[in-house]
Every structure is written in C-alpha cells, then in structure tokens.
A protein has these predicted regions:
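Conserved micro-motifs of the catalytic ATP-binding
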Residues: 31-36, 77-80
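Short alpha-helical segment of the dimerization/phosphotransfer core of two-component systems
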Residues: 11-16
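Short conserved segments within the C-terminal catalytic ATPase subdomain
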Residues: 57-68
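Short conserved segment of the HATPase_c
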Residues: 128-140
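Short helix-loop "hinge" at the ATP-lid/N-box region of the Bergerat-fold HATPase_c
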Residues: 96-97
Length: 172
C-alpha cells in the first residue's frame, strides 16, 4: 500500500507541476514574454525522445504506444526550439492517453509529405464531439470531457507550432 501511495503522489505531483507550467506559459503568451530558443533541431529526434519517454509510462497504464517513421529516407533538421517542440509532442501524447478511452493504444507516425514533415498522433478513443472540435485549441476550453487538465495545453501547442511556421490540426 505504501508503494501504491507513493506512485499516486508522484503521478499527482507531475500533473500539478505540468498544470503550473501550462499556466505560466499561458501568462507568457498573453503578455508577450513567450520566446523560442531557436537552433538547428532534428525534428524526428525530438519526437522519438518524447515517444521513448512516454512508452514505459503508458505501458504501466495499459496503453500501447506504437511509432513508425520513414526516417531512414531523410533527416529533417529545422530551425526551431527543441524544448518547445518536445513540449508539443509530450502534451499531445498526454492528451491522447487521457482521451483515448477504452482504445488503450496510441499510434505515432512521422513522414515527409511534399515539402513538409507530417507528424500524426492517433488514439482509439470516442473522439471529440463534432460541435466541440472547432473550440479545442481555445485557451481554457475543456468541452464536455471529464478528463483532468487546465484547457491550456492545446492552445499553447498551437502557438508553439504556429511560431515554427507549422500547422497544428486536430480531427476525429
């Protein structure tokens, strides 16, 4: 029981730390202090690090995390902020786990499509109600979901991706 109690405390402290960080980032976005530390960044390496970091954590929760890539064909180095990009990947993976329902599986893929790198994260949950889909990237929007969270993460992700001249799309 002590071990289980410690596991719960660690998980909750991680959740609260993430929420505080999201609130701080939201505040920085609002007052213009949100900056990128741009350097040559291997986009797929950052994605692979996030997948690797979450794979074991998800496995412990009974969620399979699968990753596929055509990385052998090319390397995608961009001018970007590796920490912010990894933050996007981690936030999206966390959302997929929270909202994946009984699907218990998340698929991540990375591929070059025309002149863009396309990264897809797919969960097998019930999806977002169609009437809520246009609002999910708005700050503080939580919709009808009962899942934990601040409603800030996807808005921050959208801003980070936009500042990297990318697009952040969410669909069912």
């Amino acid at each position: 029981q002590i071990k289980r109690g410690v596991q719960i405390m660690v998980k909750e402290s991680r959740r609260l730390t993430n929420m505080v960080e999201e609130l701080l980032q939201f505040s920085r976005l609002e007052d213009g202090r949100f900056t990128l530390q741009v350097e040559d960044t291997d986009l797929q390496a950052e994605l692979e690090d996030a997948v690797y970091s979450y794979r074991e954590l998800f496995r412990q929760d009974g969620i399979a995390l699968e990753y596929s890539s055509d990385r052998a064909e090319y390397s995608e180095v961009i001018s970007g902020d590796p920490e912010r990009l990894k933050q996007v990947f981690c936030n999206v993976l966390d959302n997929a786990a929270k909202h994946g329902g009984a699907g218990r599986r998340i698929d991540v893929s990375a591929a070059k499509e025309e002149d863009r790198m396309v990264i897809r994260v797919r969960d097998y949950g019930p999806g977002i109600p169609p009437e809520e889909l246009p609002f999910v990237k708005q700050k503080f929007y939580k919709g009808s979901s009962k899942a934990r969270g601040s409603g800030i993460g996807l808005a921050v992700c959208d801003e980070i991706v936009e500042r990297h001249n990318g697009t952040f799309e969410i669909s069912n």
